């Protein structure tokens, strides 16, 4: 049983071991939820950030991520789309802001950013979103040091680059990019002064040990990622994981709660697969530390609750919308 006075939960750490994370992940659920709530209340207010996600360029990705319908290796029937023009993207951002979102995330189905007109347009989009008074986030694969610096100069708030799963299970999910490639990308983002958005997916066929290992990598980043998206697999026909069954909502609750304990100040984002959770399960996730959601009826190529449904949910829960920009009080190890 967790002792709420336990010193190992009293400060922010960067030296978590896989075995102790696995122990936390497997605690009796009521104890795990209790400890996560204590830590969440200690380090955060009960506010939820509303982030809107838009697919700027859809389909045709050269990576072979087995969960993704945008991969050229997938036979799913998604409608590919070339990169939208700057004006169209900014109009979408304006709509998201009008609906209440304060963070606009833009996704490109790329293996990596390439210099040229598409990248220059990306920079314009970032500047335009910031001029609207919103946080700007980009997810577009790997990038160079110079590209990261140019994005920082454009005012990019955060760059998303997920680890997906544990280092050990990773080879079962993707082989066209290494785990180290992902870590190097995150390092470049951090070195450029851009906030890091980095999380993973559960329900890929991994076990609890893999989940603990993923959380070990994330929680030992120094500083912690400012945002940690926790996704559950949305099995899409035509992808390599189309036969995977939905995870139980308790597994998502455990993952959210454990992430909150390990990374007390990070925004823990309840992400893909949220539509499959009951209203009650989502409320428990908020109680256990989730303080950000993707807001709007679509996440890249998967569905999501509507603006109206989410506004009603948050009103029923009684949490406030978080309008504090992600400048984030970064706690860094002094060791």
From Swiss-Prot:
Q: Where is the Radical SAM core domain?
A: 46-274
Under the heading HAMAP family, the entry gives: BioB (MF_01694)
Q: What is its EC number?
A: 2.8.1.6
- Purpose: Catalyzes the conversion of dethiobiotin (DTB) to biotin by the insertion of a sulfur atom into dethiobiotin via a radical-based mechanism.
- Asked whether the UniProt record includes Glycoprotein among its keywords, one would answer no
Catalysed reaction(s) here are: (4R,5S)-dethiobiotin + (sulfur carrier)-SH + 2 reduced [2Fe-2S]-[ferredoxin] + 2 S-adenosyl-L-methionine = (sulfur carrier)-H + biotin + 2 5'-deoxyadenosine + 2 L-methionine + 2 oxidized [2Fe-2S]-[ferredoxin]
Annotated GO biological processes are: biotin biosynthetic process
Return the similarity comment.
Answer: Belongs to the radical SAM superfamily. Biotin synthase family.
Among InterPro entries, the record links this protein to: Aldolase_TIM, BATS_dom, Biotin_synth/BioAB, Biotin_synthase, Elp3/MiaA/NifB-like_rSAM, rSAM
Residues reported to bind [2Fe-2S] cluster: 105, 137, 197, 269
This protein's UniProt keywords: 2Fe-2S, 4Fe-4S, Biotin biosynthesis, Iron, Iron-sulfur, Metal-binding, S-adenosyl-L-methionine, Transferase
The major lineage groups are: Bacteria, Bacillati, Cyanobacteriota, Cyanophyceae, Synechococcales
This protein is called what?
A: Biotin synthase
Record keyword 4Fe-4S present? yes
- Oligomeric state and partners? Homodimer.
What cofactor is needed? [4Fe-4S] cluster; [2Fe-2S] cluster
What's the name of its gene? bioB
Which NCBIfam families does the record associate with it? bioB
């Amino acid at each position: 049983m967790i002792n709420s006075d336990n010193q190992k939960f009293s400060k922010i750490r960067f030296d978590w071991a896989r075995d102790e994370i696995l122990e936390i992940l497997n605690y009796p659920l009521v104890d795990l939820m209790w400890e996560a709530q204590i830590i969440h209340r200690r380090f955060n207010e009960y506010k939820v950030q509303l982030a809107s996600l838009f697919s700027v360029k859809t389909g045709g990705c050269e990576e072979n991520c087995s969960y993704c319908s945008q991969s050229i290796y997938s036979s799913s029937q998604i409608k590919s789309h070339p990169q939208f023009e700057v004006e169209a993207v900014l109009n979408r951002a304006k709509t998201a802001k009008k609906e209440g979102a304060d963070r606009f995330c833009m996704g490109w189905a790329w293996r990596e950013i390439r210099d040229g007109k598409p990248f220059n347009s990306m920079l314009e989009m970032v500047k335009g979103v910031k001029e609207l008074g919103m946080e700007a986030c980009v997810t577009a694969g790997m990038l160079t040091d110079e590209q990261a610096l140019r994005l920082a100069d454009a005012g990019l708030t955060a760059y998303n680059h997920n680890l997906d799963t544990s280092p050990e299970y990773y080879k079962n999910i993707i082989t066209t990019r290494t785990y180290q490639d992902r870590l190097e990308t995150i390092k470049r983002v951090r070195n450029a002064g851009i906030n890091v958005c980095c999380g993973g997916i559960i329900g890929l066929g991994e076990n609890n040990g893999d989940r603990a290992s993923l959380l070990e990598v994330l929680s030992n980043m120094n500083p912690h990622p400012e945002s940690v998206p926790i996704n559950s697999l949305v099995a899409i026909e035509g992808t390599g994981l189309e036969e995977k069954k939905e995870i139980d909502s308790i597994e998502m609750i455990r993952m959210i709660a454990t992430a909150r304990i390990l990374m007390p100040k990070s925004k823990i984002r309840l992400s893909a697969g949220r539509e499959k959770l009951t209203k009650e399960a989502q409320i428990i996730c908020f109680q256990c530390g989730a303080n950000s959601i993707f807001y709007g009826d679509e996440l890249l190529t998967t569905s999501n609750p509507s603006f109206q449904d989410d506004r009603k949910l948050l009103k029923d829960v009684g949490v406030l919308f978080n309008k504090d920009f992600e400048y984030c009080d970064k706690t860094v190890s002094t060791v």
